[in-house]
């Protein structure tokens, strides 16, 4: 059952709010960077009169970002960016704080897009997106609103790729800041965050030991790098599957084996996809896999593993581990285990990235929203990098919160770095 008050909220259970408040408080206590930004926002109110529409994984860390934007004067409407990642307790708690929340765990595809439409019905000035579903939706279903949107931010690699495609085709109608492409995002969130949280979700769902297992990581971008290194740290034998020769060479130099999926399919005990592309594990690969193989996806959308093949070719389908694992029994007796329906494993089966990592990423989001509020009307449609001063400021705030001081260049060193006369 879902409790709906149109124009205000649509959530699973308002009585879950006390637990949600506790979850948010714990996250808030471990997010000092956003805390520092929130204090400034409370004083300066840079978002006064701005409505922010958000499509993010709706959980405790996201709630702290919502609070930060509201402290700056924004009105917020939010929904989830994945049908299985919403924490119903947090949704209930945010409603009590006056947030327009339209999300619950286990949405159908129709409900998922209906909730995005509900957010867009608030006519947001700025959109904060994860995966670009909301940005794409406002262009296709709300074209008049798209003309009035000041700008947007995008959290993920997958979303940024979609936005570049929109811009190439000439359909993107407002500026979007690619938060994903900031150094403090991809070096920390994509690598350390995904590396830890993807394996955490896998282990929560299965309770298996990784030591001694052969783990195949599909994709060696920043997310794949993090997963591969954390899996090795837990004692796994790691194989990397890549299409990019430079990334493949890096994986080799990092000490991993590299091979095509056809060969890796025969060796792997566990497969984790992290490509942002579709059909990277297909039926012909599944046919070669071992009995008891485990498949998990760390990419944004559930298109990396061929679920249709499993559904169409299995003789029996069984829910395991409280629904976190689906067992497919194939005609030859082989068992294939799919984690969280092939959706984002770290959030569908776990609690997402560590709090301290999202403190950094959401600080980038908050400051990027501020940039759009101040400068967005003068920016042309397109995909923009996070301003360097914002990227640097987030790193400075994080280091300050950790009590870390940096060395400083002397005047002579600064002058030397600008000169060309001195040589050997």
From Swiss-Prot:
It is found in: Cytoplasm. It holds the Pfam family AdoHcyase_NAD. It catalyses: S-inosyl-L-homocysteine + H2O = L-homocysteine + inosine. Binds 1 NAD(+) per subunit. It is an enzyme of class 3 (hydrolase). Transmembrane segments: none annotated. Keywords: Cytoplasm, Hydrolase, NAD, One-carbon metabolism. The keyword NAD applies. InterPro entries: Adenosylhomocyst_ase-like_sf, Adenosylhomocysteinase-like, Ado_hCys_hydrolase_NAD-bd, NAD(P)-bd_dom_sf, S-Ado-L-homoCys_hydrolase_CS. One of its GO terms (biological process) is S-adenosylmethionine biosynthetic process. NAD(+) binds at residues 156-158, 190, 219-224, 242, 277, 298-300, 346. This is S-inosyl-L-homocysteine hydrolase. It comes from Methanopyrus kandleri (strain AV19 / DSM 6324 / JCM 9639 / NBRC 100938). The lineage of its organism: Archaea, Methanobacteriati, Methanobacteriota, Methanomada group, Methanopyri.
